[in-house]
Amino acid sequence: MRTLSLLLIWATGTLASDAPRLRALIVDGVNNHDWQAGTRGLRQILEATGRFTVDVSTSPGREAPATAWDAWRPEFDKYDVVINNFNGGHLEDGLRWPAPVEEALLKYLRRGGGLVIFHAANNAFLNWPEYQEIVGLLWREPKFGPGLIVNGQGRVETIPAGEGPKAGHGPRHDFQMEILDPQHPITQGLPAKWLHPSEQLTHGQHGPAEGLKVLTYAYSKDSKRNEPMDWIRRYGRGRVYTTMLGHTWLNEPNPNYDCVGFQTLVARGIEWAATGKVTIATPSELPAPDHAVLRPLGER
């Protein structure tokens, strides 16, 4: 049986009290998931580390008039890291940001900014070519481009374009996360394998699939393959961290956000995207292959 322990505080020494805080901006507003719950959970996780201050820029709604979109201009350059929690759809007619906002994000990244692609945000912007390059692997048809898996020897293997299953997922469930690169600052000190509760395990990602460093993976019962869960890449001088974790759905509990493994991995990934370094320590109690450890975030 899965053992669920409750952690009330981060490990002592996670962050020096006088260390400067990083400025994080979460962008949300449209998503097929419960993006309000996702944004609240992310904010709580980041603020609990003491390393971040967090602002939110919520876009107009899908049916908002052009005047509302014309007035929406997130100021990316004010922040150390931008977290994308926006998904306008994964089809050709998916909702895009206004051209000035897209160009501002590209300039921000090219100049050395940090970007996080959070869960369903990797589904977005099929009709924005630069976005495919930024993310590397996305919710796309097999014909779109190559895919990546982790083979039985722990090596990343390329699946040619046109092959492999379509992007998809089964119902949320507990599954085992595995660390592919234990020496990277984001994953260093985390257990080699740990149980993550009640999460959506996405399979069949495709894209340019170039220049990625896969950090974690999980075995999908649907695709019968080891699927990348977290990865990083560079875009210009900028740093991009993608996590497929963080599923939320309307009128469903989200114990995956209470998972200490998830909280630690995501907070460190966001810090790396912001600075290229990681100072957030691992908590004193960590999950194991057969049990999760939970630190409740409270009502989301």
Name every feature range the model reports, one short phrase each.
Residues L6-S17:
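Hydrophobic h-region of N-terminal signal peptides that target proteins for export
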Residues G112-V116, L215, Y241:
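Structural detector of well-ordered beta-strand residues that form the stable sheet scaffold
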Residues D18-I117, A121-F125:
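Helical hinge/lid and interdomain linker segments adjacent to catalytic or ligand-binding clefts
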Residues F118-K221, T282-R300:
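An acidic, glycine-rich "communication" segment
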Residues M1-L4:
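Positively charged n-region of N-terminal signal peptides that target proteins for export
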Residues D18-L22, A37-G38, A48, P74, ...:
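Extracellular ligand-binding/catalytic regions of CAZymes and related secreted enzymes
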Residues N31-N32, G88-G89, N122-A124, A192, ...:
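Short, solvent-exposed loop/turn segments at secondary-structure junctions
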Residues G29-N32, G162-K166, G170-F175, T248-V260:
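Active-site rim elements
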